[in-house]
Amino acid sequence: MTVQSPDDSTRAPATSTAAPATADPKIKARGVKVFYGDKQALFDVDLDIPAKSVTAFIGPSGCGKSTFLRCINRMNDTIPSARVEGSILIDGADVNAKSVDPVVLRSRVGMVFQKPNPFPKTIFENVAYGPRIHGLATGKAELEAIVESSLKKAGLWNEVADRLHQPGTGLSGGQQQRLVIARAIAVSPEVILMDEPCSALDPIATAKIEELIDELRSQFCIVIVTHSMAQAARVSQRTAFFHLGKLVESGPTEEMFTNPRDSRTQDYITGRFG
């Protein structure tokens, strides 16, 4: 995928050109604002995210992309000064409704962080932990089947099948990140959020994670924050560009990278700022 560089006079004015993704999105955000104390970090975000696809969030550091990502599974609840306004619906249900248990929500919406964070447990127990506490397995055999299936989906089973009872922290960085993805998959989520999942990995491990993301998108709604526009172009079907706490533009990834509608998007993807 190449980046088109139209003359400045042909570019769209600097107004938001974000558009709904589908008529029936998996995730639907409207008027989302985030405050940390008196400081507003996110301004009136409207965004639709489709099911069974990869949506990439791009933008310079501090633009609000990770802040918005954390709204989807209410991770901002863990920050005492944070306040979220607006609505985020998953399959039509507001994640911020008082009746929603954040723990249950986070089993539906898994999260993979920037640095691999396996539990200080065995490889098996890392994956078994979620299904066990959520009562997803009725016995040992079913739990073992979930662990095996999750590790296979994460592309890790063949590498660890003979050492399941060794510490997860003994794996390489790329293997640890795939273990974390297996842990998320094990509780049968509907959405997987990834906050710069490859930033701490070498190119070979990054390529394996990207291959895994491509394989998983047929089963899950995946949202990835990345500073790498090349990665966004490789793994995503839709892209959303954030700048200064605002969603500037969203749309099909190929269109965003070859024919952006907003001048700020064009400037960012061509390296004029960021």
UniProtKB/Swiss-Prot annotation:
Region (Disordered): 1-23
EC nos: 7.3.2.1
Presence of keyword Ribonucleoprotein: no
Main location, first listed in the record: membrane
Classification via Pfam families: ABC_tran
GO cellular component terms listed in the entry, alphabetical order: plasma membrane
Localisation: Cell inner membrane
MF (Gene Ontology): ATP binding; ATP hydrolysis activity; ATPase-coupled phosphate ion transmembrane transporter activity
Low complexity bias spans: 11-23
Membrane topology note: Peripheral membrane protein
GO biological process: phosphate ion transmembrane transport
Positions with a binding annotation for ATP: 59-66
Keyword field: ATP-binding, Cell inner membrane, Cell membrane, Membrane, Nucleotide-binding, Phosphate transport, Translocase, Transport
Signal peptide: none
Domain spans labelled ABC transporter: 27-269
Family (UniProt): Belongs to the ABC transporter superfamily. Phosphate importer (TC 3.A.1.7) family.
SUBUNIT field: The complex is composed of two ATP-binding proteins (PstB), two transmembrane proteins (PstC and PstA) and a solute-binding protein (PstS).
Function comment: Part of the ABC transporter complex PstSACB involved in phosphate import. Responsible for energy coupling to the transport system.
UniProt protein name: Phosphate import ATP-binding protein PstB
